[in-house]
Amino acid sequence: MNLLENINSRPLPLAQLMGITFTHAEPDKVIARMVVRPDLCTLGHTIHGGSAMAFADTTGGAATLINLPADAKGATAIESKTNFVGAAKEGSTVIATAVPLHRGRRTQVWQTRLETEEGRLVALVTQTQLIL
């Protein structure tokens, strides 16, 4: 089973609920896509900050899982910081790209860029995962 199949074979209820699709997975990069549906938007018809954060958290979490040390039982986020830079309109597709900043035995730090299909930055998220 390759890394993308590994991620896609896991039960990820929030990812399924939000319509997140993982399209690429390697140790140094995980990419996912999500259509900005009306139920994921603000009253102004742009992606809600909570939806953006959940999308980034899900992508960074998946990246952590495929990079766990062999003796790890799992991981949990212990810190997350989001810089909101731009908007993504209802109906558009947002792409999340997670790359590692640090991969240690006890913690991993991932940075996830959320961009529109046109390449406009929506948010930049940095999260720290505690390895269990």
Region locations from a protein language model:
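Terminal targeting signals and extreme-terminal segments of soluble enzymes
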Residues: 1-132
